[in-house]
């Protein structure tokens, strides 16, 4: 090998290229500052224009060197393609990294007037549907994305390449091998019938590492790139164009001597240390295996970390010297010190790595000067530093180069290094070297995807610092340097030779300033480096004629895949579509599946045309996988669903001309107050109701009284056509008169005012909702329902009267006033002088028989009942309703307001009881009011006064209907709502159709199972859902355990999870359309309408769907927290929490179990589509398999255990297997039985709690089960019953854990509360569960016998009165109920976690501290300390619940002797600093929110409100937020705020039309008062 290359060898390959330098120039230390040709530019951009013209006509790969503005070319090309007159086709710009995507997107947006958008994985595009992609394609013209995104979109057939007119590929030299660029071209471009134009951009056509041995080798790589991209390399002829317009770059080498050999003694010491600590890690790994924790991957990580650190230190030692090797060890040590591990074993591994690096530091330190082991004075001792090996010759030359920059502050230098460790240690060296203090140095390395946010921020900030001269020396790696936007520099130094031609070419692009340099470091006498540089400089890019035809296309690849040919979607073995991983997860494999192995399962999955998983078949997913929080069945996701109609309420009799036959159901009402009479009613339906629906009772809760409603069937009844008309009149008249309106239209709205029953009301009678509610004669027998036709006929006569005589227009056509007697023939002679007669609009009545008479106002259509005739009053009496109105008398009021001239103004006024809206009578709000809003002592709640109307009798028409009928009509909306709910429950029961002997399930149970907590009822699905969850888990576990005897516990758990997961239950539930039956909204009586009733409170549908049923489409899903759950539109659409759909399935399983046991619940599961079953033969087979196992008893090892559990096993091996830990390495262990026993105990305990505590609420039931069913509780059961002594094990770590647990088992906590600081080993809880599983099999699935054995073992089970919540949760709930906030602070010193909780009471700041292994345990201990302090002040969860008091009832004042000294933090801040609040948000709810955040921040208790209401017949006027509002009610609230260490502040707000607005007003007034007292400062 020659030491230099002759000139003729430099010219090999022909042609003269000024970039090819003669190697004879490299062998000397020539002056690197030789002057080059001045830089030449062309203001017209001739070169860019030439490239653009060629790219416009054909596919090219533009090799753009230094100084060429590729943005200008891209802009011209995009503008030309984007402005074409053809149909819209997309322009796609591809960049290989996310940083480049963002950078190019910003540049393109600034350059072109088109709609540009960027796409990459972090935007969640992997989950986008076809509709979402279609929206993106339609809204944007230019799409900038990574190639993998485009590849996935094409594979899913969301996009076809025919829709693209231009494909720009940046850094296109990556189009090789398995890069997404190459896959894109092979799979789609060459297959496309209408190909887009290709424009490739690169600085070098070849990227591959290694030495390019010959021009032909290089040309072959270029040819391969051209074939794949269907394009030609474009370079100007002999690069004259480039050299003409590119910046001049001066290039020169720096030669350095080889590094002297390091001390063999030192290297041997380092190697010995590495082997020693590596062996320590291996020993820890062996111990980890004994504990049977899955630690192999973690140990491999630590071993790899140890080896990497060792190699990095050796690299620095060989190439940079002793000092840098010492610095490298420091860097590695800092990194390992930042590692936090919770496991003791992992902490030991981390400690081993740390001790290794400390040992390395100590070993290297011996060879460095003792006075300063970091640095030497390079200015004075550079030669001795090199000789001693402290600094390598290469590093010395770098420092000499940097020293030449002294005094030139404008000098900016980029230094390219191969390894990150090189950049880090040299940066440290430079910063510590005093002679280089004039340099501002930083390093920038590759952006690892796992890098934290601060590191990613530095990737952006460091180049900016370099550009503005704040950093003049920047170390970078070639990975960052390629494609990264690094600012201009005056010197580019390749400290390590570039490995690829692309990297070499890119390195030249950064030296773009005038008189710039490009410097290579070369080792003297190193032929490998010289040859490598030679090949890098011989970039033999073939210059071809731009007008020549393109190279032949790449042959289409062989596709081993699965897809939909019609639309082009496909999955291939190397597909990145997630369905391949999903498919692979369904296979049981010992090793990770290969890409080819994933493909067959993909074909078995049910996929849609876009290869997304459809809902048609159950997806078997891995257990406990971290699915999206907004997936199906999650709490976060809300879904729009329709509401199923009750078929029993439908009818076709509306148009029958011959009458109709009905099924009659009588409603009887009985009040608990004697003398209160309610009329019975009859419900007439076309359908026959189920027995338990047609005969039901319910309680109706009125104010201070209870009415029992009972429904009973009364057989068939037939109505003639005439009777039907009158019956419909009655229903329309009363339901509209009392809950709606009888007069429709308004002059103010420009519509004619009409009597409702004079108009066409057929639209109010819909066949899906057709029934009649008619009064029944009061003396009727309970078993029959005789319609009260006298009342109905009276109503019909009034309807006819109003059609002719209602005062609708109030003035005649000439604008004259109307006389009430004009044209009303039915009126008696007004000259009648009988003093006891009262003249009504349609009749006269005796004055003494007016009480409870039902009347209707003929000018408003409102229905009243008469209380009395007011003596000494008449229409000429002073108008007292509104003194400020200006009306002198009632007669004047009616004359001026309505244009009515009264014919009998001297008659006494009628005192009338007004009709009101319907109320929800199904919930006992009286009881709830006592619990939630009981006023504080001394403030007795006043009963609201009754508001009566006063009208002249001649404006009233008498209706001969008892007032008891009106009273009953107020009850009917609630009765019908409950009855309709039961009809739906019965309808669902018929669909499920469980025909099992001696089985029946009530509609009430079904109704409970479909009612959520958001529906304010006295029942909900929660308890049944809790039970159903356990039943389903138990059944699924038994089914899998018996069906798959060869599967291990992990496989069984994954399959069970796939069955019982919320997402699977959601899929099955929606496939059965159960979502329409779910009741999740409050009953709104004002929106309930009877057939024929006009709704006063319509909610028009704005859901974007015309049908009642809502399809399962992502556009009807949301995560919006402001969505109102359960509030339906008039089409029945409402938002439902996705988890409620899954919970409904479990609740129905629970309901069927309660009614019919496991057989009924199994039927329910099968109806849903859950494939589970109990085959008795499988149980026998399982016992037979166990019985055949060889078992030789050893000294009665099982007899003692059988005695403890009081059961003798028929299959002894079951018990042997149940106590065998896997550490014994037998062919069996307890894991499968533990899987079964876990579900058995969960089910048995849940069933016990469900049956024992029937009145316990769902929340407390969940807490009880959690307290009973957990591994810690079972571990205590094992120790208490001495079952742990029978656990067969051979694991040192487990043995230690058990012994430690036994020692701390009886150790009391310092707070006196049972918070074990040591968690029980999982194996102890597992053995209890495995024994339960063994017992279940041995008893042939006899659950009662298993419970007989385990109930005494588990006793005493926790009871509601002894339930102890986790301390932190208990504190949180207690403070929430009392209106107090607390502040939490957590920290971790690497050994233990510390937690501090501060709670501010009225006059004392309480502090609780805790220190434990984890933050959770530390918080629990801190909360426990606080709860203990609160209990001393008689503040606890039990006392507040027991006394049934609110936060205002609890005495929070402390005796002065008990007061704790406030911390200096609290006293000083409160005494000196006045806190700021606001600015106040004046929108509705804004002031309350502002005060809430302030109280939370400063630990002030939440305020309390006391509200008074005033009602009026005439509307109040309010000015609220600059807007005028009117309301018949006025609310005024008083707020009380307890400020710590001050007197309570009380302030009243202004009157407002609603209660919440009055709260806001009170808060605003309070805040201004606080500011006046200088307690707070309100920010403007």
Curated annotation (Swiss-Prot):
Domain PAZ, by residue range, is 836-960
| GO CC term, one of those recorded | nucleus
Comp. bias regions, Basic and acidic residues? 1-12
Bias category Polar residues: which stretches? 581-597
Outline the extent of the Helicase ATP-binding domain.
Answer: 51-223
The residue ranges of the RNase III domain are 985-1157, 1198-1340
Q: What is its main location?
A: nucleus
Which residues does the record give as ATP binding sites? 64-71
Molecular-function GO terms, alphabetical: ATP binding; double-stranded RNA binding; helicase activity; metal ion binding; ribonuclease III activity
Q: What broad class of enzyme is this? A: hydrolase
Biased-composition ranges for Low complexity?
622-633
Q: Where does Mg(2+) bind?
A: 1234, 1326, 1329
Enumerate the residue ranges of region (Disordered). 1-22, 581-601, 613-638
| Entry cofactors | Mg(2+); Mn(2+)
Site entry (Important for activity), positions: 1322
Protein family according to the UniProt entry = Belongs to the helicase family. Dicer subfamily.
Assembly notes? Interacts with DRB2 and DRB5.
What is this protein's record name?
Answer: Endoribonuclease Dicer homolog 3
| Name of the encoding gene | DCL3
